[in-house]
Amino acid sequence: MYLIEQQDEALNYRRRHSGLIGVSSKVPIRDRAVLSLVYTPGVAEACRVISEDPLSSFELTSRGNTVAIVTDGSDLFGLAAGLPEAALPLLEAKSVLFKTFAGIDAFPICLDQRDPLSVVETILALTPTFGAICLDHISAPHSFTIADHLEKGSNIPVFSNQHHGSAILVLGALMNALKVVGKQLNEIRVVIGGAGVA
């Protein structure tokens, strides 16, 4: 009974708030002077500077503190050929975690594409907006193809939750095990088998 009540409560919580995330301004517009700094004519100068130095977008815009959390919904809690929309609650929840625990603005992006190269092309087209990409819940083997292509073709960091996250967990477990047995990494041999997908 508790599980059903908890599930209902989780759904009602999301309904009450129309999802978990939203966009809000960092600056209050109280008068025309501030409006002219934020929008016309002030915005033109920021655009000009970025057109001459694209990396300045990391300091003049929110780009340096944003990550795109991207999925195609293909590996979502065992749901067969999951719809991308079904992943939105998960990505919103992860966005809340990014903001709460790291102060990073994360945006959920659910792609309605299954072809790995189309996914790569779409994500690469989005990179001017974000400071990093986080791939999440994309089924193997497509997830490997997508991560590999993005790591080679993107000019911003790419993190695959299932691949890199699994590796971090295994390394953490190994380092803690070494502490327990009182050994150093260079004193042991380790064999890790598997494709690296959680």
Residue ranges of model-derived segments:
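N-terminal ligand-binding/catalytic initiation module
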Residues: 1-158
